[in-house]
């Protein structure tokens, strides 16, 4: 290391040419808010010189451009991009996302520690810096059937891995508040490290109790009022804009220069089609500035404030001694990355090609029994039926009640009120559970949509008008080893295979993007009105997000944390 330090000193002072010098541009100083005209000297993975002129062995002209620190996605599930970590790296790093803090609890719920190890192995090979948080709630609750169980004894061996950053989102906030021994054991083991939160709508003294355990960050705020209370109580708020959960607009009032030290950005769940059409964190930055947010506030949240929230003290500024994660932009407002450096390496196709591949895992994870149309029947009742109310752009659902029509001795859908059937089928080969219910808000007039992506236990979830089409869609998932399927009038009109744990494709992200475009069109042909019907479907079984959900064990009243049917 002493040789490296000597090199850093000599190149920083200018005694020797730097490895790389960016010349002729300006950099955005996130401390003062100034645009500073200066060369930027890089030695190895580190910035060694600013605010002066430098010579370099390689000099790159960035005249007319603005250089900012690399962007940090502070909470995401790479599995929701439907591609491997290697393909995610290739997809978003060119957009300026140089660090991603991921929670692999999707694959962990299916494969357990094998899934976590797959992510850690991948993170050691990617060009972007992928950091892994250890999945805290596998299974998420006792109200569903997962493919794995991760008690604290299975997590602690990973704690000191160089890519591990802490304990991932603690979703079981009722378990924390009610002092569940399993929850407390995990929290106790990670005292002094980073513990990520997940506390939708938690307020008042219950929030105090939750935070008293050492939890410091939260990405579930859906209103400025909720976010402000959590900031007052010492939390960093991770402003989220994913493919389904879109909270940026609601939280813009808190994205100010004064509050920016307590903010960061995240996507949580974002698929390659949305990344291709809109972008990633760069899309959030553009959107916020166009809506009137000060550039200094949003760029701080995208980098230095994010780094500080997670203890990544080596990155987030364009300054000597800091990690050379840099994005060369056309302008602050457009936030279009023209050049990206990750750890001092210029991001190119050739750089990606040098990565070592990681063998896929979980290629035979869909073990569901074959179902028939009759399995989707719901006996008729004259009393009101609980219906899951979908809110576009939200993973929070409403608990609605309706009198539904009789079809013989069965309860039928009510297309006039946009109410169709929903079912969850256990697919890990544990118990063969099957639960049926009703959902409002998808817009379907015919057919069915099915998925093995079903947060967080990732059982098969299917919505539809026709029970025959629902059965065909669910069974087709077994044949393709997991994925998404669209069925119309007895035939499959769209599908994507996700054979890695039933969650991720083996294909390049460009191919996944193109298939997703076709899938959306197939879903829209059924009448689907949701912008992202597949990921919206995937959140119907998530029993840690209010208010009504469905698991393989039945309908879940999340407010009561209990099965109700």
From Swiss-Prot:
Gene3D superfamilies: Metal-dependent hydrolases, Urease, subunit C, domain 1. It comes from the Bacteria. GO terms for biological process: adenine catabolic process. GO terms for molecular function: adenine deaminase activity. InterPro entries: Adenine_deam, Adenine_deam_C, Amidohydro-rel, Metal-dep_hydrolase_composite, Metal_Hydrolase. It is an enzyme of class 3 (hydrolase). It catalyses: adenine + H2O + H(+) = hypoxanthine + NH4(+). Its cofactor is Mn(2+). Its EC number is 3.5.4.2. Keywords: Hydrolase, Manganese. It holds the Pfam family Adenine_deam_C. Belongs to the metallo-dependent hydrolases superfamily. Adenine deaminase family. PANTHER family: ADENINE DEAMINASE, N-ACETYLGLUCOSAMINE-6-PHOSPHATE DEACETYLASE. This is Adenine deaminase. It comes from Sinorhizobium fredii (strain NBRC 101917 / NGR234). The gene is ade.
């Amino acid at each position: 290391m002493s040789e490296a330090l000597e090199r850093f000193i000599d190149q920083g002072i200018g005694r020797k040419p730097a490895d790389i010098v960016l010349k002729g541009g300006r950099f955005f100083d996130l401390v003062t808010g100034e645009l500073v005209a200066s060369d930027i000297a890089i030695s190895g993975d580190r910035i060694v010189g600013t605010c002066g002129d430098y010579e370099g062995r390689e000099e790159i002209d960035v005249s007319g451009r603005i250089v900012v620190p690399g962007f940090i996605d502070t909470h995401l599930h790479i599995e929701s991009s439907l591609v491997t970590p290697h393909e995610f790296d290739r997809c978003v790093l060119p957009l300026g996302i140089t660090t991603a803090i991921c929670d692999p609890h999707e694959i962990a719920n299916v494969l357990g520690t094998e899934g976590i190890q797959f992510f850690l192995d991948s993170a050691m090979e990617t060009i972007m810096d992928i950091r892994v948080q250890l999945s805290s709630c596998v299974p998420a609750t006792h109200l569903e059937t997962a493919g794995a169980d991760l008690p604290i004894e299975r997590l602690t061996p990973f704690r000191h891995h160089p890519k591990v950053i802490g304990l991932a989102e603690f979703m079981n906030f009722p378990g924390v508040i009610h002092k569940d021994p399993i929850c407390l054991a995990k929290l106790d083991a990670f005292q002094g490290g980073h513990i990520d939160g997940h506390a939708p709508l938690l307020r008042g003294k219950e929030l105090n109790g939750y935070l008293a355990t050492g939890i410091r960050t939260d990405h579930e705020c859906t209103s400025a009022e909720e976010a402000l209370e959590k900031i007052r109580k010492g939390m960093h708020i991770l402003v989220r804009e994913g493919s389904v959960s879109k909270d940026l607009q609601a939280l813009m009032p808190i994205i100010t220069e004064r509050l920016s030290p307590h903010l960061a950005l995240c996507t949580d769940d974002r698929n390659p089609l949305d990344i291709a059409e809109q972008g990633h964190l760069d899309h959030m930055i553009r959107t916020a500035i166009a809506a009137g947010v000060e550039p200094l506030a949003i760029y701080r949240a995208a980098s230095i404030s994010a780094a500080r929230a997670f203890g990544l003290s080596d990155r987030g500024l364009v300054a000597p001694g800091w990690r050379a994660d840099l994005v060369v932009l056309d302008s602050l407002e457009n936030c279009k990355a023209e050049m990206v450096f990750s750890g001092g390496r210029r991001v190119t196709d050739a750089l990606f090609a040098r990565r070592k591949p990681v063998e896929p895992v979980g290629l035979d994870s869909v073990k569901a029994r074959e179902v028939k149309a009759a399995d989707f029947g719901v006996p008729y009742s004259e009393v009101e039926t609980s219906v899951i109310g979908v809110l576009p752009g939200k993973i929070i659902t409403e608990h609605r009640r309706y009198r539904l029509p009789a079809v013989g001795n069965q309860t039928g859908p009510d297309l006039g009120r946009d109410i169709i059937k929903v079912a969850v089928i256990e697919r890990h080969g544990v118990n063969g559970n099957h639960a049926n219910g009703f959902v409002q808000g998808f817009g379907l007039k015919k057919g069915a949509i099915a998925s093995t992506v079903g947060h967080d236990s990732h059982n098969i979830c299917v919505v539809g008008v026709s029970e025959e089409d629902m059965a065909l869609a669910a069974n087709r998932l077994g044949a393709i080893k997991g994925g998404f399927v669209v069925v119309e009038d007895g035939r499959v009109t769209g599908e994507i295979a996700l054979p890695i744990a039933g969650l991720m494709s083996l294909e390049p992200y460009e191919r996944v993007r193109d298939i997703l475009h076709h899938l959306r069109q197939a879903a829209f042909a059924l009448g689907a009105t949701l912008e992202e019907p597949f990921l919206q479907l995937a959140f119907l079984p998530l029993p840690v997000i209010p208010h009504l959900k469905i698991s393989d064990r039945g309908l879940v009243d999340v407010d009561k944390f209990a099965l109700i049917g």
